[in-house]
């Protein structure tokens, strides 16, 4: 340690002469300092005051008398106790001779050599040789432990030496006596432990740890009272009036400056143990009595008092300076200092108000702009003023109806909740965020990232201030001015542009989860941040809300807008106002859907990144030698984060299913694999040794090239992989652990194929927006051509169903079996084999016969949807005999139609009008297709095809009704019944939804009894489902209202004409036979 500011002569580390100073000893004044050959000279301010403002010559006895009672920072102490602890082993004592050479870390001084008689030698300056510095071999921080007091009384932290061969009670007893704490009324805990320590443990074991002192249950009051009594007894004696100025005012400024420099740079001088530890801190030395806390009265009769500023917590300050070289102790001391600074700052905020935003965040603003912003904030505060109820804005609210009052309440709730939300946003920005930034300006909580904690909440607050000022305030001002009702349609201006105004919410909703996690981590690990948040949550503006609750407000507010608007809509009667509210609701819900989509895609990307991290290598191809391996290395990779082929780049590949399976390829042995099914591909991987990562062992299988089949073996299924030519290039058999899991894999694969097909259709619609317009134009042209044709040229002609495609190879009518009514049309891919073994017989049963029930004119309304048919009700009147003649029972159906109740028809000349025919529709997907074979079968062929062998089945055939009878029934009011959607054909699974595997089908077997099922239609439909999605023809299904509307246009005369035509057809057919 260096000497004090007022000491000259020998250094503090050297012991003074043990002899008493002689009365006639001579003083030598060199450079303004007194030197004595056998005594020390003290220039301390207090010592000069005691010696009539002159330097004081002290021997060892006098020094012990005058300087042992009080502690002076930077003042030399001559009476050092003997070494009694490892902490004082580097101090010069009687048992350890003083060092005669300067320390290695001191600056070189000029020292004059004196002889034994006290004469100064005239020899030249001698430069002492530096010696190697002795360094500690132990960590000083482990030779002591920190004592924290977890009491209701403010007690400073103590640092206690951890001595060997001493128990914890023996070491803590002097400290507790000085604090006035009874050792038996408190418990000692180690760090964060909740188990009290035994006082018999060796104290040395706790070196470098924190010990907490906590009062035992029931003794809290006694411990607090003892500490208070101890503090009152240990107060220093006050100096009487007139004794002179305080000591702190009499200190020389130069001495104060040197003292501060010594404290700031303790490594520049030798440490004096007595200066830092004091007599109470050195083990083996008895502390001075509490009563000797003032300097003795000098010869002048004046008294001196202690220093109030340095009286509190001397030991803690000495230890912090002594252990400044230890990282852990210095960090703790800095933490204590920062906590005190934080508490003082927060206390100032509570007393003098919250601070403004730091200027460093307003570097682009001038002073006059800041003044304008302050004025704007005041205006905003006044603009957020809202009446207690909407009734204060309206005159004559007593005369309003109940429904009008409810509507005004709903509108008022929208306004009131908006004001409350803006105020909560201001609490976040002005209380939490602004105080945090100001604390960081002061050097506190600099490790906290404000943007990571609060995201873009300032942008959201600015957004809502603008929405309030530009949209909602005018509505209020209008109501205040006109004293009229609040009009919900006035909000359309702001909510119509909801998507563009509320864009900052996209970022906040994406980062909200990260902000919450970051906040929880800070509250768990950062004491300063925890204290700051606790203070802020107790502020009156926070209204007892937690910071986590405040951060969740933006997300909650966004989802509340549709609910508030729908509440207004339910209580509104005006059609124009309803239309405006519906527009606002759709705009808000569209934006919320967009936000949900962004969040879902972000979650899928995170999930996909987790899957990618689990895939270790891509080892699909093995090289034959090193050269091949080097060439292959460039291509042995798989990027799952790349966009899916044929879909929008915004779409993210999703993980649909994963799990362990047992795979068998060909005739090889089975192997355990781990499969990942994504939206567009299937990955077959194998676990590596660590079992946490996998490697790809088979090429990725594209979902649209997969054909999935269930096998007879329970829990197993087959995957056939096709190439671009629809040829099989691979077959994999997978075995699941259960039948349910196997079914789950098969269903998920089908769902993935459908989902991929939908995504590609959406991209095609976006890239070719004019294709739908072109399709509608073609449909209009076809309708005009059909309306211009006349069908009355031949009595033998019958209504026909027009073919869908004009580029077919076979477009002529097939007149097999002598029937003239063409009922169905077949569209079959060339080379497709859909025939069933049950119906392979004769040239009539071709491959087009079976598929005629599944792909028949998808745009036509099925006959079964117009009216329910019984099991034998669906017979045609012209087919009751083998020759096509009419039976007596069928003739009764053509008598004057009784169900039709109409007024007497006006006689009119029958005009040539087109016979009722079904409209032609173009396909949905206008893509190049291979030529299709179009074949039609007569009704007789259809009956034979549907019933198979009637004799074998024993059930008579059930043909369909004739077209004339259908038309008669369709025009009868109240006769036609509406069938459920699920009965309208297998293609109708819901409103507007078409079965992804097979299109709308015109099947008569749907209306037949249960014992008639299982025919070729079911077989064809099952085979269609098993076909790959790439080969399925997609058709468009339309609701059954078009055909019925067309039939309603027929008059009674036209129906009679149709009946006559059918009778003539039957007669001619019989005569020809």
Curated annotation (Swiss-Prot):
User: Where on the chain is Phosphoserine found, per UniProt?
Assistant: 798, 911, 936, 941
Pfam families the record matches: RhoGEF, SOS1_NGEF_PH
Molecular function (GO) terms listed? guanyl-nucleotide exchange factor activity
Residue ranges annotated for the DH domain, each copy included: 406-598
One GO term under biological process is:
endothelial cell chemotaxis
Residue ranges under compositional bias (Acidic residues)?
367-381, 777-790
Q: What is this protein called?
A: Pleckstrin homology domain-containing family G member 5
Q: Which organism is it from?
A: Mus musculus
Q: What is the lineage of its organism?
A: Eukaryota, Metazoa, Chordata, Craniata, Vertebrata
């Amino acid at each position: 340690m260096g000497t004090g500011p007022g000491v000259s002569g020998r250094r503090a580390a050297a012991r003074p002469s043990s002899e008493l100073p002689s009365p006639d000893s001579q003083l030598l004044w060199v450079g303004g300092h007194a030197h004595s050959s056998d005594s020390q000279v003290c220039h301390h301010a207090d010592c000069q005051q005691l010696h009539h403002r002159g330097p004081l010559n002290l021997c060892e006895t006098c020094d012990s008398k005058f300087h042992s009672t009080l502690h002076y920072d930077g003042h030399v102490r001559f009476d050092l106790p003997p070494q009694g602890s490892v902490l004082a082993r580097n101090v010069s004592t009687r048992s350890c001779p003083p060092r005669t050479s300067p320390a290695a870390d001191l600056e070189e001084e000029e020292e004059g050599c004196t002889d034994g008689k006290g004469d100064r030698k005239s020899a030249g300056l001698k430069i002492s040789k530096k010696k190697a510095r002795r360094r500690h071999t132990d960590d000083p921080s482990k030779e002591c432990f920190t004592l924290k007091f977890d009491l209701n009384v403010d007690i400073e932290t103590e640092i206690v030496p951890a001595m060997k061969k001493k128990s914890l009670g023996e070491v803590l007893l002097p400290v507790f006596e000085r604090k006035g704490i009874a050792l038996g009324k408190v418990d000692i805990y180690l760090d964060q432990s909740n188990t009290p320590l035994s006082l018999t443990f060796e104290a040395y074991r706790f070196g470098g740890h924190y010990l907490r002192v906590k009062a035992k249950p029931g003794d809290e009051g006694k411990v607090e009272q003892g500490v208070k009594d101890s503090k009152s007894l240990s107060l220093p004696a006050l100096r009487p009036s007139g004794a002179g100025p305080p000591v702190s005012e009499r200190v020389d400024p130069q001495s104060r400056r040197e003292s501060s420099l010594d404290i700031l740079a303790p490594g520049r001088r030798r440490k004096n143990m007595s200066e830092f530890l004091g007599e109470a801190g050195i083990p083996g030395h008895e502390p001075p009595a509490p009563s000797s806390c003032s300097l003795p009265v000098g010869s002048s009769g004046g008294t001196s008092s202690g220093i109030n500023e340095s009286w509190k917590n001397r030991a803690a300050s000495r230890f912090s300076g002594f252990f400044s070289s230890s990282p852990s102790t210095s960090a703790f001391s800095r933490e204590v200092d920062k906590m005190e600074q934080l508490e003082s700052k927060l206390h100032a905020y509570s007393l003098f108000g919250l601070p403004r935003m730091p200027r460093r965040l307003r570097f682009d603003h001038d002073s006059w702009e800041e003044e304008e912003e302050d004025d704007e904030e005041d205006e905003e505060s006044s603009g957020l003023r809202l009446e207690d109820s909407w009734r204060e804005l309206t005159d004559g609210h007593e005369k309003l109806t109940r429904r009008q009052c409810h509507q005004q309440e709903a509108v008022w709730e929208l306004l009131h909740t908006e004001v409350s939300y803006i105020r909560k946003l201001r609490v976040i920005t002005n209380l939490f965020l602004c105080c945090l930034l100001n604390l960081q300006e002061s050097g506190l909580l600099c490790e906290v990232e404000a943007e990571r904690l609060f995201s873009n909440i300032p942008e959201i607050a600015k957004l809502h201030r603008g929405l309030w000022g530009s949209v909602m305030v005018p509505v209020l001002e209008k109501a205040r001015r006109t004293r009229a009702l609040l009009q919900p349609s006035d909000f359309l201006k702001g909510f119509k542009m909801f998507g563009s105004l509320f864009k900052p919410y996209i970022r906040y909703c994406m980062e909200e989860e990260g902000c919450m996690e970051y906040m929880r981590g800070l509250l768990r690990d950062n004491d300063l941040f925890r204290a700051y948040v606790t203070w802020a949550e107790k502020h009156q503006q926070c209204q007892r809300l937690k910071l986590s609750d405040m951060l969740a407000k933006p997300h909650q507010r966004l989802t509340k807008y549709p609910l508030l608007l729908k509440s207004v809509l339910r209580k509104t009667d005006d059609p124009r106002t309803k239309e405006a509210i519906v527009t606002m609701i759709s705009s808000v819900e569209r934006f919320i859907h967009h936000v949900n989509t962004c969040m879902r895609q972000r979650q899928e990307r995170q999930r996909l990144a987790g899957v990618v991290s689990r895939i270790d290598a891509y080892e699909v191809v093995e090289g034959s030698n090193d050269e091949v391996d080097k060439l292959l290395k460039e291509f042995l990779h798989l990027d799952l984060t790349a966009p899916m082929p044929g879909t929008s780049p915004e779409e993210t590949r999703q993980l649909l299913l994963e799990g362990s399976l047992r795979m068998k390829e060909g005739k090889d042995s089975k192997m355990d694999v781990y499969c990942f099914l994504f939206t567009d591909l299937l990955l077959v991987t194998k676990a590596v040794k660590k079992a946490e990562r996998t490697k790809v062992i088979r090429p990725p299988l594209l979902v649209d090239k997969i054909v999935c089949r269930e096998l007879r073996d329970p829990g197993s299924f087959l995957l056939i992989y096709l190439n671009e030519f629809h040829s099989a290039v691979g077959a994999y058999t997978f075995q699941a652990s259960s039948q349910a899991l196997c079914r789950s894999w098969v269903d998920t694969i089908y769902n993935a194929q459908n989902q991929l097909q939908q995504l590609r259709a959406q991209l095609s619609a976006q890239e070719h927006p004019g294709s739908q317009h072109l399709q509608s134009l073609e449909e209009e042209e076809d309708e005009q051509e059909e309306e211009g044709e006349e069908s009355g040229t031949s009595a033998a002609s019958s209504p026909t169903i027009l073919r869908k495609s004009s580029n077919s190879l076979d477009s002529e009518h097939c007149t097999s079996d002598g029937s003239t009514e063409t009922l169905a049309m077949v569209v079959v891919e060339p080379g497709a084999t859909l025939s069933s073994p049950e119906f392979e017989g004769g040239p009539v049963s071709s491959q087009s016969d079976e598929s005629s029930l599944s792909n028949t004119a998808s745009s036509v309304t099925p006959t079964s949807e117009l009216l329910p048919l019984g099991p034998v009700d669906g017979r045609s009147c012209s087919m009751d005999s083998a020759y096509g003649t009419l039976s007596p029972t069928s003739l009764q159906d053509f008598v004057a139609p009784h169900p039709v109740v109409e007024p007497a028809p006006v006689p009119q000349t029958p005009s040539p009008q087109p016979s009722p025919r079904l409209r032609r529709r173009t396909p949905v997907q206008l893509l190049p297709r291979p030529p299709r074979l179009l074949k039609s079968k007569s009704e007789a062929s259809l009956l034979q095809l549907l019933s198979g062998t009637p004799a074998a089945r024993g059930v008579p055939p059930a043909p369909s009704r004739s077209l004339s009878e259908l038309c008669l029934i369709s025009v009868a009011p109240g006769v036609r019944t509406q069938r459920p959607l699920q009965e309208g054909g297998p293609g109708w699974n819901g409103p507007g939804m078409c079965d992804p595997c097979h299109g709308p089908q015109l099947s008569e077997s749907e209306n037949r009894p249960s014992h008639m099922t299982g025919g070729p239609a079911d077989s064809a439909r099952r085979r269609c489902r098993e076909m790959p999605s790439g080969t399925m023809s997609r058709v468009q299904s339309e609701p059954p209202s078009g055909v019925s509307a067309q039939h309603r246009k027929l008059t009674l005369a036209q129906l009679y004409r149709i009946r006559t035509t059918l009778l003539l057809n039957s007669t001619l057919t019989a005569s020809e036979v």
